[in-house]
Structures are given as C-alpha cells and as structure tokens.
Design a protein with these regions (language model features):
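FNR/FR-type flavoprotein reductase catalytic core
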Residues: 1-115
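Cys/His-clustered metal-coordination modules, chiefly Zn-binding fingers
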Residues: 93-173
Length: 173
C-alpha cells in the first residue's frame, strides 16, 4: 500500500537554503509574500544556468493557477517552494497530487512550522508546540507522550496516552 508524501515539520523536503539541482531540465520557483526574498535570492543565483519559471501566490485564491503550472511541467522539473507553513503545505499537496515525488521538491518554510500529534486514545489530531515531548489532546484532554514516529496516514506524530504523576489518585477514585 502506497501512501503519498505529506509535508510535516521534519520532512526531507524542508531545507534552510535551496540547492540547485543542475541535472534537472527546468526549475519552478513558487513563493508567497513571506517567501519572496528567499525566492528572489535563489533566482539571482540560478539565472543563466537552467531555464526557470516563477510563480508568486497569495494562498488558496491561486490554487487553480498553481495546479495548472504544476501539471504543465515536463518530467525532470525541480520545484522550489518558499512560503509560510499553510501556503507551503497547500503547494506541496498539489504537487504530490499531480504526481511529484519528494525528490522533486525543496521547501523553505518562512516562519514557524506546525506540528501535529495523533491521539491513540480518541484517534483525533491536535496541533502541538514544535519541540514539545508531552502534550494534552485538544479533544479528549488525555496527556500524551509524543513518540518519534510520524504517521503519514494519520498526518501526525503518534501520541501515547499516559497518566501524569499526581493524577493517579484522581483516576483510582
């Protein structure tokens, strides 16, 4: 069973700086307002080396145009995304939906990344702090130890319920 890649806080596609993949036939640089400077800097670096195309987006209102641009590319195109988290996730998802692999995408996230935990008690997903090791489920209020494993199917790190020290008495009453 194949599960499509998803963008998460530790994805291999997330980089601090774009790296030109000169073996590719063309580059497509997609950025939102937040990622404009990163994209501009990268474009000045690659100008004259490989053909490229740029797309500036404003979020969901550009969804159809993003889809059109991605679908119109030939094999061998490398995609670069410089955007805030929500826009980066949207563009990444559209790319994967169109058939791109993680190797064909590099993403620079501008601003904070989002991290999600999948509760093994109520089977819901909650947003958690980026470096949190323990969290409380937003849905059932269970205390969760955040495991190291990210579930592509559940789109979150696995959260294992536990009873925190001091609450054992309440539970046993």
């Amino acid at each position: 069973l194949y599960n499509s890649p998803v963008l998460f806080d530790k994805s291999i596609t997330i980089v601090n700086q774009f790296t030109p993949r000169n073996e590719r036939r063309k580059f497509v640089v997609i950025s939102d307002h937040a990622g404009y400077e990163k994209a501009k800097s990268f474009i000045s670096e690659i100008t004259g080396t490989v053909p490229f195309e740029c797309l500036s987006i404003n979020g969901m209102e550009n969804k159809e145009e993003i889809k059109r641009v991605i679908l119109s590319q030939k094999m061998g195109t490398q995609f670069y995304i410089a955007a805030a988290w929500n826009n980066a996730v949207m563009v990444f998802s559209l790319g994967v939906e169109a058939g791109l692999s993680e190797a064909e995408i590099q993403t620079v996230i501008i601003g904070p990344k989002r991290r999600y935990v999948y509760c093994m008690k109520c089977f819901e997903v909650s947003e958690v702090a980026e470096e949190a090791e323990i969290a409380e489920c937003d849905h059932c209020r269970a205390s969760l130890e955040i495991g190291p494993f990210y579930s592509i199917v559940r789109e979150g790190y696995i959260g294992y319920p536990f009873i925190p020290v001091g609450k054992e008495e309440e539970v046993g009453s």
